[in-house]
């Protein structure tokens, strides 16, 4: 009887060990396969624009730049886009950003909203700070003003006054510089941001049209259909609007 009991215990222990090993292998296999396959690729869905209808009166197309300053200070209806920081965007844009950030998180990308709507005082302070940095480097007043505007437009020309502009970085790259375009977060945004209504506001090699240097962190809400059409065109917001209004 004792021998039979010992065998029963032995068989039970073996069964437990096998079960645990099987569970461990099943847990580990997907992770090993993912490692062998490499990082997940982010690929934008195709869009032919067949059903796109341009509406020149769409408020989300509000355009501001050094050649087209605000005629009057905007007053967008705001909502919290990020509750932790309290950063706000225009209400529709805020809801879209939250959906986008949640979708990115599901793909292992942690987006960080670092700036949204800014009032005139905040925009003016940002411009003056940038300008002062150039003055301290020995630039003249005129040179400093021009160089600052390429990066941080004056208050009346700053996209952040619309409520639709969002500076987006990631937890692993929290610095606003062009190096952000090497990150997985930028890759994700390039592929999927348009599906949530956001476009890259200042694309590379488009400074002649936008008046601002390449800013991979600066995204602009224009609505899903508009964003998909703009992304498909490969144009900046300025170029897209000019083309649509001319046709």
Features from the language model and the residues they span:
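Extracytoplasmic cell-surface/polysaccharide-interacting catalytic and binding patches
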Residues: 2-247
